């Protein structure tokens, strides 16, 4: 049996010690919702120039959660391209 340690995005960001992230690619099989909701609520998303996201639709309330994340993300980023529930790319504008 293998035991994995789960760390928060806040801890990882602090450990890396970098203020600016050029590109973040998110494809974590349904975990993207919790990750992005946390990053948006803590303003960590403002430190990322480009974010590429694969949203998965098998998560409960996937469409509503995706819409809410996209709305919040649009305050700091612009969607450059989107294939709904396949891949999308966002570029920071503020």
Question: Could you tell me what each predicted segment is?
Answer:
Residues 1-7:
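Adenosine-cofactor binding site in Rossmann-like domains, unifying the SAM/SAH pocket
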């Amino acid at each position: 049996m293998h035991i994995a340690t789960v760390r928060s995005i806040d801890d990882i960001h602090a450990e890396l010690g970098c203020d600016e992230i050029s590109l973040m690619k998110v494809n974590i099989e349904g975990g993207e919702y919790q990750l992005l909701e946390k990053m948006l609520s803590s303003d960590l998303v403002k430190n990322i120039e480009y974010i590429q996201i694969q949203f998965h639709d098998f998560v409960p309330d996937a469409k509503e959660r995706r819409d809410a994340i996209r709305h919040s993300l649009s305050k700091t980023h612009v969607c450059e391209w989107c294939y709904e529930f396949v891949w999308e790319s966002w570029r920071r504008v503020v």
